[in-house]
Design a protein with these regions (language model features):
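Single conserved hydrophobic/aromatic residue that forms the stacking wall/gate
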Residues: 1-9, 13-14
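Metal-dependent amide/peptide-bond hydrolase catalytic core
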Residues: 19-205
Length: 205
């Protein structure tokens, strides 16, 4: 969360607006991602909300930005957060404004263990057949509290397909207001949990 605050008086002719400064901060964050991080070190910096003012003929006192940062490692996450905080604090100063950061640390990166992922794969193939298991081609920046468990224990975070039949490739994502869930998939999810437990107990991995 970032707050850009005007420091000048109330006369519009001499008051700097935080709106263009907020836009500059947004652009600088995108440049930070592409210039300070390797393409082999994926990061995401999303400005999901900008709020400033209440009408079109009054210069607002403040501009607020809500920003989400994600990465595939803890070290990269810290570098990204540090870089974004520096931009928010320094760019407004060049315009006579003040930038404040309220950093709320979310969940750490969700990183599977190879052994845990192998258990899930074996259980899924045994329960659903080879066609019922699919390895994701690229890493997914999941933000999950399960990541805390993965920091301490061997395990894996897996997805359960819940798209209604006949909608593969066309179904809305789970965070969409158009999402439709095949409720029969819940039975598959329960069976998968049981299959994973049995796979571990049988010592097949």
């Amino acid at each position: 969360y970032a707050l850009l605050r005007s420091l000048v008086g109330s006369e519009m002719c001499i008051r700097d607006s935080p709106v263009p400064v907020a836009c500059e901060v947004v652009q600088a964050i995108q440049t930070l991602v592409t210039r300070q991080f390797s393409v082999f070190e994926p990061v995401v910096a999303t400005v999901g909300r900008i709020q400033a003012g209440t009408t079109n003929n009054v210069i607002p006192e403040t501009a607020e930005l809500d920003i989400t940062l994600r990465s595939l490692s803890g070290d990269t996450r810290e570098r990204l957060a540090s870089g974004v905080c520096n931009l928010i604090e320094q760019i407004p100063v060049a315009h006579g404004l003040q930038g404040e950061v309220k950093l709320k640390r979310g969940y750490p990166p969700t990183i599977n263990h190879a052994a845990g992922a192998e258990v899930v794969a074996k259980a899924a193939k045994a329960l659903l057949g080879e066609e019922g298991y699919r390895l994701m081609p690229d890493p997914f920046m999941a933000s999950e509290d399960f990541s805390y468990l993965l920091q301490r224990y061997n395990g894996a975070f897996a997805f359960l397909g819940v798209a209604p039949p006949g909608t593969e490739g066309k179904a809305a994502p789970c965070h969409s207001n158009h999402m439709l869930v095949d409720e029969d998939a819940m039975a598959v999810g329960v069976a998968m949990h049981a299959a994973i437990v049995l796979t571990c107990l049988n010592g097949s991995v």
